[in-house]
Regions:
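A short, N-terminal "cap"/entry segment at the start of jelly-roll beta-barrel domains
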Residues: 1-86
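Short histidine-centered beta-strand/loop micro-motifs
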Residues: 79-83, 89, 100-105, 110-113, ...
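Double-stranded beta-helix
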Residues: 2, 128-150, 172-204
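Glycine- and acidic-residue-biased ligand/ion/polar-headgroup-sensing regions
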Residues: 94-95, 107-109, 113-129, 134, ...
C-alpha cells in the first residue's frame, strides 16, 4: 500500500474512534518528530509490536480484504517480563471489508463489537491435512453461550457482544455490508502476528 493510503486510513480511523468516544494511547497520535523525541523510551513498544498496522494482506483490494489494526498492548512470547501478560487490539473495518480466512495455533481471542456497524463472522473447521472443512458445523461461544453455525454461515454480532475464537478454527470477520463501518476489539493471549497467522486465502 502507498504511504498516502496508509496515512488516510489512520486519519479516517481516528475520526471514527473520536466519533465513538474511544481514545487510543498517546503514542497513537505522535508525529514523526515525537517518535524521534521519544526513541529512547519505546523499546518495549517496538518489541511487542504496539501501534498501527494497516494492511491489505497483499490482496491489492484494501476495501474488500484488509483492516486497520492498532495494538494497544501486548507481551512477548517467551519473555514474560516484557510488556503485558495479555494482548488488546482495536480493528477497524470499512463497510464490507473483512480479514482473509485464517486460524491460529497458539492464540485464543475474544472479538468484541465495540461500535458502529454489525460484525459479520464465518467459521470453518480445519481438516487433518490442514485444508479448510467447508462442510462440518462449528460450535463457538458468544459471551459464554454455546452456539452452532454451519460452515461458512454468516454470524452477526451486534454492538457490545462478542465471540471467542479458539486455536485451529478457521475464521474471517469484518463489517457487514449495508451496516456501515465497524470498530472491533480483540482481547487475547500474548501473541505474535508474524508467526501465528495461518491463512487459507492468498496473502503476501
Amino acid at each position: 500500500m502507498k504511504r498516502s493510503e496508509i496515512n488516510a486510513a489512520i486519519k479516517w480511523s481516528i475520526e471514527l474512534l473520536d466519533k465513538n468516544n474511544f481514545k487510543l494511547p498517546r503514542f497513537a497520535y505522535w508525529t514523526m518528530d515525537e517518535w524521534e523525541k521519544n526513541k529512547d523510551k519505546i523499546d518495549t513498544l517496538r518489541e511487542v509490536m504496539a501501534g498501527w498496522d494497516i494492511t491489505d494482506f497483499g490482496s491489492g483490494k484494501f476495501d474488500e480484504i484488509g483492516a486497520i489494526l492498532f495494538t494497544i498492548r501486548n507481551g512477548k512470547l517467551g519473555k514474560p517480563g516484557v510488556g503485558s501478560p495479555y494482548a488488546e487490539k482495536i480493528l477497524i473495518f470499512k463497510e464490507g471489508q473483512r480479514l482473509p480466512i485464517h486460524y491460529h495455533i497458539e492464540k485464543t481471542e475474544d472479538i468484541i463489537n465495540r461500535g458502529e456497524g454489525t460484525m459479520e463472522m464465518r467459521f470453518y473447521l480445519k481438516k487433518e491435512d490442514g485444508s479448510v472443512d467447508y462442510e462440518s458445523d462449528v460450535t463457538y461461544y458468544s459471551d459464554g453461550i454455546p452456539c452452532v453455525a454451519k460452515a461458512g454461515e454468516p454470524v452477526y454480532i451486534t454492538r457490545g457482544n462478542s465471540v471467542r475464537l479458539v486455536p485451529y478454527v478457521n475464521h474471517t470477520f469484518g463489517a457487514k455490508m449495508g451496516d456501515g463501518p465497524l470498530i472491533a476489539g480483540e482481547v487475547s493471549k500474548v501473541n505474535d502476528d508474524n508467526t501465528d497467522n495461518y491463512f487459507a486465502e492468498p496473502t503476501a
